[in-house]
């Protein structure tokens, strides 16, 4: 939230009641809204469906395989009693992270936090996740056909490294080589040549080690526009287009596994990374949100060390990360 400095105490009063004394009167109304939004985002949308299937296929044991809000059957079953019990277990001051950025002092912030948060039971800290994901033993594939969807979607995930480890920063740099900036490899070698509508790579922040993801959308296949095709033939045409894009994406990974990134390319992505991070932190709200998220994941000091850790990444680190993590037996394709 963004509030005037002289309204800080009122904000503490309101937010503490919202967090720890919520009203449940509109639970079932809001539940229906959430169900509709979930269906729109994950059931009827190729992009959302691809993300859902990617994580459900890549993970067999770790909770990362489940959507944050649960599956359709979970939402249908949720009751007010379930929500109240979940809130009682997890929404307490011990689990809360409060970050304030702006015209205030530490003493003022501490006094207000103690006044408005300590009036509630401290509660217990959420337990750590103890279920580890077994090592993937071979490639996995999931295919979904959405009726009426015109733009096919490709997602390729590889089990990666946890945040704040040397390999995580190497994979971050690798993703930037592939897709950060207009001269990135996937843009230059695939999109600009008209071989696909989009192509990108990402290394999402994950406390327990997430997925390094390649993604994109192929061009609409010429075969799908031929008159008289039945549904099965159209599906075959779209699937072949997706498989063609998958081959192009994996070919770029192969290059990174055999060739070192040039000094010029490495300098370019580090410069872009520094600029993008500074741009993301221009507002007080962005700084607060970033620090709060990082504190929950690995600790807020990660932000103060990030650029230094990224600047230390070498071309050899990038190639080693590609060889270690982006292997066929760790690949999941959707």
Where does each model-flagged region fall?
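M16 family metallopeptidases and their MPP-like homologs
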Residues: 1-17, 46-73, 95-101, 150-162, ...
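Active-site-adjacent, His/Asp/Glu-enriched structural segments that form or flank metal-binding
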Residues: 1-48, 77-80, 84-95, 115, ...
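Surface-exposed patches in mature extracellular/periplasmic domains of secreted proteins
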Residues: 23-30, 47, 123-126, 259-266, ...
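An aromatic/glycine/proline-enriched structural segment found at the starts
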Residues: 26, 60, 68, 93, ...
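Short, conserved secondary-structure transition motifs
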Residues: 35-41, 132-145, 271-280
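Short beta-strand/turn micro-motifs at beta-sheet edges
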Residues: 84-88, 141-145, 198-204
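Extracytoplasmic/secreted cell-surface and envelope-processing proteins
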Residues: 106-110, 166, 223-225
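Active/ligand-binding-proximal structured segments within catalytic/core domains
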Residues: 156, 166-178, 186-190
């Amino acid at each position: 939230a963004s509030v005037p400095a002289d309204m800080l105490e009122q904000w503490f009063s309101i937010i503490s009641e919202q967090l720890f004394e919520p009203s449940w009167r509109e639970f079932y109304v809001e539940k229906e809204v959430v169900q509709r939004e979930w269906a729109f985002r994950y059931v009827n949308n190729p992009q959302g469906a691809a993300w859902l299937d990617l994580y459900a296929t890549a993970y067999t044991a770790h909770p990362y395989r489940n959507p944050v809000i649960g599956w359709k059957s979970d939402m249908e079953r949720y009751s007010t009693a379930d929500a109240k019990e979940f809130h009682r277990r997890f929404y307490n001051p011990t689990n809360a992270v409060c970050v304030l950025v702006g015209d205030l002092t530490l003493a003022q912030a501490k006094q207000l936090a103690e006044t408005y948060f300590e009036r509630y039971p401290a509660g217990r800290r959420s337990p750590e996740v103890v279920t580890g994901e077994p090592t993937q033993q071979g490639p996995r594939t999931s295919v979904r056909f959405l009726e009426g969807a015109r733009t096919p979607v490709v997602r390729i995930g590889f089990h990666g490294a946890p945040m704040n480890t040397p390999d995580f920063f190497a994979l971050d740099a690798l993703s930037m080589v592939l897709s950060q900036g207009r001269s990135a490899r996937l843009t230059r070698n695939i999109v600009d040549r008209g071989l696909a509508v989009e192509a990108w790579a990402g290394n999402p922040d994950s406390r327990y080690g997430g997925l390094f993801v390649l993604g994109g959308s192929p061009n609409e296949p010429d075969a799908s526009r031929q008159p008289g095709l039945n549904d099965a033939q159209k599906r075959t045409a779209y699937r072949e287009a997706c498989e063609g894009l998958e081959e192009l994406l994996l070919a770029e990974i192969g290059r990174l596994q055999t060739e070192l990134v040039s000094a010029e390319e490495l300098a370019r992505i580090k410069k872009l990374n520094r600029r993008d991070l500074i741009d993301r932190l221009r507002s007080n709200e962005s700084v607060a949100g970033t620090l709060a998220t990082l504190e929950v994941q690995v600790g807020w000091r990660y932000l103060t060390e990030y650029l230094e850790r990224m600047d230390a990444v070498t071309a050899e680190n990038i190639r080693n990360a590609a060889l270690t993590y982006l292997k066929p037996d760790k690949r999941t394709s959707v």
